[in-house]
Amino acid sequence: MPRALVATIICVVAAFQSGCSRPSIKIDGSSTVIRITEAVTEEFAAKHPGVRVTGGRSGTGGGFKKFSNGEIDICDASRRINEIERKACEERGVDFAELQIAFDGISLVANPQNDWCDCLTVEQLKAIWQPGSKVARWSDINPAWPTAEIKLYGPGTDSGTFDYFTEAIVGKTGACRPDYSASEDDNVLVMGVEGDKYALGFFGLAYFEENKEKLKLLGVDPGDGNCTKPSEDSVRNLAYKPLSRPLFIYVRTSSLARPALREYVEFYLDNVSKIVRSTGYVALPDEMLDRSKQALDEALVAIPVQ
């Protein structure tokens, strides 16, 4: 079964279908985490035919809106739920389990023809991306660099990657200059940076790994003179500052009463470390994955099986 792309539907259908309705699972959220979820679903499909899993990528913020409205069972998230989203869930009676599944690094990328920049400091990145930025050309960052206009690419405002990047770099979630090319589809961002010599963009590390022949990976200096690029080691040990981040799935507790959903989430946690490595992300240490499994067990305790 091919992996789904934007707002696609992954359907797992039994070979001989009766007239009964099929169990269904609805997932939406982060375009970063959906890559892991698609891979998990593909393996789940082979072992559990007859379950229909629908998956979309509205971005972390868009996913939480649907989650708090009770429209989906699982929200893929590239950041933790914020207080506004948490309150929306509480007001609508949506209880949930927060399950960390992996680590990721936000990659800072340029066009391969860029031969003048290998690293940017957090201070420089803030100057580029903050609201009201006066940085329009590469030479505005460093007079020795080209006078050509910087073409900026990044995720849209519903993206958890956007939220995490703006908080880590600018200092406030969502604070960003508006004049950049935005997309919730990271593949669109890859194509944008690939097609413009003077481009600069950011998105999840897995998308760089998948397209490394088309892009140049830049390092980030947090201000201590150490320029670090994201890698499995630098992300896991948080040496890649400040753009290493945890990835999550949020599961609606009431949905766990459905055997198909419960089995899917258990399968997810049992197989995610293997799958994460194959999709370009960074697996959790065993003790952290065990905490996610414990959180799921605690959520299951009081749930009656349907």
Describe the residue ranges of each PLM region:
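Bacterial N-terminal signal peptides
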Residues: 6-17
